[in-house]
Regions:
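Alpha-solenoid helical repeat scaffolds
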Residues: 1-276, 281-327
Length: 327
């Protein structure tokens, strides 16, 4: 400071160099007003200053939480650097992103993040850009951004994979979603728990890959706290004529509980038993269904189960008559 205060008494070159040094020292000592003052004076005396002092001023204003002036200096520094073809560091762009983020200026956050993913492709920039796209309702752009990051092998965390899979499901591309989830599970990025396995099973099922969905649902059902996944399995087994497994899954669902309508599961169980010609256990299942439906005031299923009971009673009588006639 003593040298600076000499003004015209010292050589101009020494004064300019000293001003810059004092500005930096003031910043290190957290004397931000002094840092601003000496750097501004330096800029007026320096010959054709580069972008660096503007980035310095932006950093000082950032420390002072004057984000408007920090943005002004950052943008000016970037303009100078671009005009001269000099480098703009990742740190510079990241600071500008933060400043616009604090201002909730989302169009500019997106603009700067687009530069970061292009010039400094890292997971954090890709995921942040995708997040802002999603926040602002640009779901297509969010999907394309996460897809690009996935293709470039930047996705690492569970949320990266599950967010991408969720967007693919929304876009009705379940087979792609299933492959993303499967990849995340294989990499151990996604935890192999009931929720994530159920998501994978649903994706395979919607992709018409039932043979792949079933073993995943079996694994998930064993981990789940309730019987809802077993319930889903019972329907899949019924549709594919695997009646023994259908009965096992329906029983598992009823044992674990937590079902929205247990009477519906009793119907599936009864149908699968009936298809194995196990009429007595099937009737028992439909009787349970009718009882629960009555308790729940579910007249529709109460009627359906009653009709099944009547039908089974007639079938039992018919089979008994045939057996007697043949005997």
């Amino acid at each position: 400071k003593i040298v600076v205060e000499q003004g015209e008494k010292i050589p101009e070159g020494l004064e300019v160099t000293t001003l810059y040094t004092v500005a930096q020292l003031s910043y290190v000592q957290e004397n931000y007003d002094d840092a601003l003052y000496y750097m501004e004076v330096w800029i007026t005396k320096a010959t054709n200053p580069s972008a660096a002092p503007r980035f310095f001023l932006a950093t000082v204003y950032y420390q002072m939480k004057d984000y408007n002036k920090a943005i002004e200096q950052m943008e000016l520094g970037i303009q100078i650097a671009q005009e001269r073809g000099t480098d703009i560091t990742e740190q510079n762009w990241s600071l500008l992103t933060f400043l616009y983020f604090e201002k909730e200026d989302w169009p500019n956050v997106i603009r700067v993040l687009q530069v970061l993913v292009e010039e400094f492709p890292k997971r954090e920039h890709w995921v942040r850009l995708a997040g802002v796209y999603g926040q602002e309702g640009f779901e297509k752009e969010q999907l394309y951004t996460l897809e690009a990051a996935y293709t470039a092998d930047f996705l690492e965390k569970q949320t990266d994979f599950t967010n991408l899979a969720g967007l693919l499901m929304q876009e009705e591309v379940p087979i792609r979603a299933a492959k993303v989830l499967e990849d995340g599970l294989n990499r151990k990025a996604i935890e192999r728990d009931a929720k994530n396995l159920q998501s994978l099973g649903q994706a395979w099922q919607l992709a018409q890959e039932v043979d792949k969905a079933i073993p995943i649902f079996e694994e998930a059902a064993g981990m789940a706290d309730d019987g809802k996944i077993y319930e889903r399995l019972s329907y899949l087994y019924l549709e594919s004529d695997q009646f023994e497994k259908c009965v096992d899954s329906a029983t598992g669902a009823l044992d674990k509980g937590g079902l929205r309508k247990s009477q519906s599961v009793y119907i599936v169980k009864g149908m699968c038993l009936f298809n194995q010609n196990k009429l007595s256990p099937a009737r028992t299942a439909f009787v349970s269904c009718r009882r629960v439906a009555r308790d729940e005031k579910d007249k529709t299923n109460q009627r359906i189960c009653g009709q099944w009971i009547t039908f089974i009673d007639r079938e039992s009588k018919r089979q008994a008559q045939l057996a007697a006639a043949s005997g």
